[in-house]
A protein has these predicted regions:
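Short beta-strand segments
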Residues: 25, 63, 67, 145-149, ...
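A glycine- and small-aliphatic-rich helix-loop capping segment at beta-alpha/alpha-beta transitions
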Residues: 66-76, 101-105, 159-172, 195, ...
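Active-site histidine-anchored catalytic micro-motif
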Residues: 112, 123-130, 155-179, 186-190
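Long amphipathic alpha-helical segments
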Residues: 13-107
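Small/polar-residue-rich loop-to-helix segments that shape phosphate-bearing ligand pockets
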Residues: 98-141
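Glycine-rich phosphate/diphosphate-binding loops that line cofactor/substrate pockets in enzymes
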Residues: 134-145, 168-172
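Conserved phosphate- and dinucleotide-binding cores of soluble alpha/beta proteins
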Residues: 174-175, 180-242
Length: 242
């Protein structure tokens, strides 16, 4: 994703590994401040998940993978590290999946950094595929609505629900995005709007309760994330999804 800084626009990810440390955007500071924090031990990485420094299931998974990477590099007890990281967010399936994935990879003798980077890249590749498939749904001049944050901040880079929006914008299409504020944590107002602003994508923040009004008034497409998808296609998303 792009981020506007004092030194110009730069490409960043929500979380990555650099020089022996896990580096991430402190999402608690957005949209007022773009701050990067870094950690050199798995305990602090787990705390960054608990205190919502990092958010979004895929980004949480990647953060957990990098936490296990640190544990392996430092020679920590991997079983103890896995249990500690899993306890950081007991309801996050991606966290458990990432920890188990890294445990299996490390037991097979994989390089810790390469294994964690590969896990994060898999998330990005899936997001890019979502963008390719979803971009044709956004027509020239469309009005699009989204809720919560299913963008690059939540998925290491690119995003799920925001992937087609990014792809359409990069392809030169002109459209408008309604971003519902997403109470009580305000992820739409604080995170999704920030991401769109960095890309200069036209948008407006609306109250959650106004979603019905704007849908009646001519929204062409609603793109959402999905916390869970049932076999019959039903899905669950953030509270306030209309």
């Amino acid at each position: 994703m792009k981020a506007k800084t004092e030194n110009g626009v730069r490409d960043v990810k929500a979380v990555w590994f650099e020089e022996g440390r896990v580096v991430m955007i402190d999402q608690r500071k957005l949209p007022r401040e773009l701050k990067f924090v870094s950690f050199d031990n798995y305990q602090d990485v787990a705390e960054s998940i608990s205190n919502m420094t990092t958010r979004g299931a895929p980004s949480i998974g990647a953060t957990a993978a990098y936490g296990m990477c640190l544990a392996a590099l430092k020679g920590n007890d991997l079983e103890k590290a896995a249990a500690f990281i899993k306890a950081a967010r007991p309801t996050a399936y991606d966290l458990f999946y990432a920890v188990d994935h890294m445990t299996d990879a490390l037991e097979r003798g994989a390089d810790p950094i390469e294994a964690a980077d590969a896990y994060a890249q898999t998330i990005i590749d899936k997001c890019l595929a979502i963008g390719r498939h979803g971009e044709p749904l956004i027509k020239e001049g469309a009005k699009v609505m989204t809720h919560c944050n299913a963008g690059a901040l939540a998925t290491v880079d690119v995003g799920t629900a925001l992937a087609p929006i990014r792809a359409a914008h990069e392809g030169g299409k002109h459209f408008f995005v309604y971003v519902s504020e997403t109470r009580p944590r305000l992820q739409g107002m604080q995170l999704t709007s920030w991401e769109l602003l960095q890309e200069d994508i036209d948008h407006a923040i609306i109250p959650d309760g106004a979603s019905g009004h704007f849908l009646r008034d001519g929204v062409d497409l609603v793109i959402l994330g999905a916390d869970r998808i049932a076999a019959n296609g039903d899905f669950a998303n953030k509270i306030g999804t209309f």
